[in-house]
């Protein structure tokens, strides 16, 4: 876990329970004598998220409707800290902060977690985009409960399912960074199979096919969890569409959960003729994932960008700064025929 992650040492359940009486009701003592919750219980996971967002990030009244993704907060915070380090590589090892740093969140969701964390940690401003109008309405209600966010978090509907960047930006809009947690699965059946497997691993087998659907403990459905072609197809489409706005975002980034997708993504980046691409490894416990980042701006353009946009912005040096990024491996060779 990232060293600046507020949960890097684990959940402080005593402090979180003091923040939220609703969470306190779900906290149990394990056989090992430690505090925990039932992570297979969606209500408990939601209360944990609400308490974390209030205790660590000052977010009041966070909530999501039934059926929407309830993401693990530490993993989302790792993404934000990792891209902050990425920006620092272009800013003399200082993380640019404040609302002048503009971040485009593709698929902001009903939970709006990335803007909440990014604004609290670094003061960044966000444009959150989604195809789901109900999700955007819930995100707007979170802003309504936290009016101090209204000037720094904007929400926008993307009405065309296959469009990611296409038709999205308005005249003159530029962003220092784009972020995305792409749909992971290829189909609803794929979602169901993974959900069933998770429940089986928890010794909670769930319902058989044809009965009530077993649920992922983090919820979610529809555009949040699946698209045709899954994660690989979505990220490839993002890369293709980024070619049409190459200098309006300095660093494009996306989470990439499946390591075997990397050769296909490398091939797409090569085809797009990006100036530079990197992978940024991330790990939470036994879970291994990574970010893929790419830019169409050369070193000189990035230095000009820094001078024009960040020199007047507050920033701070990254403690014991060490780049955890690396170019996509040149020796990785994609299959001859890409099935997606």
From Swiss-Prot:
Pfam families: Methyltransf_10 (PF05971)
Function: Specifically methylates the adenine in position 1618 of 23S rRNA.
SUPFAM superfamilies: S-adenosyl-L-methionine-dependent methyltransferases
Protein's GO biological process: rRNA base methylation
Family: Belongs to the methyltransferase superfamily. METTL16/RlmF family.
This enzyme's EC code(s): 2.1.1.181
Source domain of life: Bacteria
Molecular function terms from GO: 23S rRNA (adenine(1618)-N(6))-methyltransferase activity
GO cellular component, one term: cytoplasm
Classification via CDD domains: AdoMet_MTases (cd02440)
Keyword annotations from UniProtKB, A to Z: Cytoplasm, Methyltransferase, rRNA processing, S-adenosyl-L-methionine, Transferase
InterPro entries: METTL16/RlmF (IPR010286), rRNA_lsu_MeTfrase_F (IPR016909), SAM-dependent_MTases_sf (IPR029063)
Compartments where found: Cytoplasm
Main location: cytoplasm
NCBIfam families: PRK11727.1 (NF008725)
Upper lineage: Bacteria, Pseudomonadati, Pseudomonadota, Betaproteobacteria, Rhodocyclales
The encoding gene: rlmF
Catalysed reactions listed for this entry: adenosine(1618) in 23S rRNA + S-adenosyl-L-methionine = N(6)-methyladenosine(1618) in 23S rRNA + S-adenosyl-L-homocysteine + H(+)
The protein's name in its UniProt record: Ribosomal RNA large subunit methyltransferase F
Keyword Secreted: no
């Amino acid at each position: 876990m990232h060293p600046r992650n507020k949960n890097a040492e684990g959940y402080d359940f005593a402090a979180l329970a003091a923040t939220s009486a609703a969470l306190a009701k779900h906290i149990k003592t394990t056989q090992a004598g430690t505090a925990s919750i039932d992570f297979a219980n969606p209500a408990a996971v939601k209360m944990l998220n609400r308490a974390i967002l209030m205790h660590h990030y000052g977010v009041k009244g966070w909530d999501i409707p039934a059926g929407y993704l309830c993401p693990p907060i530490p993993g989302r915070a790792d993404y934000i800290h990792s891209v902050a380090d990425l920006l620092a590589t272009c800013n003399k090892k200082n993380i640019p902060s404040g609302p002048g740093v503009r971040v485009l969140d593709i698929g902001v969701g009903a939970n709006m977690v990335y803007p909440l964390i990014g604004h609290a940690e670094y003061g960044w401003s966000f444009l959150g985009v989604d195809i789901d109008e109900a999700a955007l309405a819930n995100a707007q209600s979170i802003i309504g409960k936290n009016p101090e966010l209204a000037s720094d978090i904007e929400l926008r509907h993307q009405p065309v399912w296959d469009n990611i960047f296409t038709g999205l930006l308005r005249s003159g809009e530029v962003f220092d960074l784009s972020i995305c947690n792409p749909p992971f699965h290829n189909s609803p059946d794929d979602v169901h199979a993974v959900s069933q497997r998770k429940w089986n691993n928890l010794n909670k087998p769930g319902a058989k096919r044809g009965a009530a659907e077993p649920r992922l403990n983090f919820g979610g459905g529809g555009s949040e969890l699946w698209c045709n072609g899954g994660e690989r197809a979505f990220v490839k489409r993002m890369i293709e569409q980024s070619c049409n706005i190459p200098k309006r975002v300095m660093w494009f980034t996306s989470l990439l959960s499946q390591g075997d997708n990397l050769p296909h993504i490398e091939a797409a980046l090569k085809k797009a003729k990006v100036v530079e691409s990197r992978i940024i490894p991330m790990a939470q416990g036994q879970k291994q994932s990574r970010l893929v980042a790419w830019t169409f701006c050369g070193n000189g353009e990035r230095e000009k960008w820094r001078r024009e946009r960040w020199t007047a912005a507050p920033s701070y040096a990254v403690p014991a700064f060490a780049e955890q990024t690396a170019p996509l491996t040149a020796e990785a060779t994609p299959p001859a025929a890409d099935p997606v």
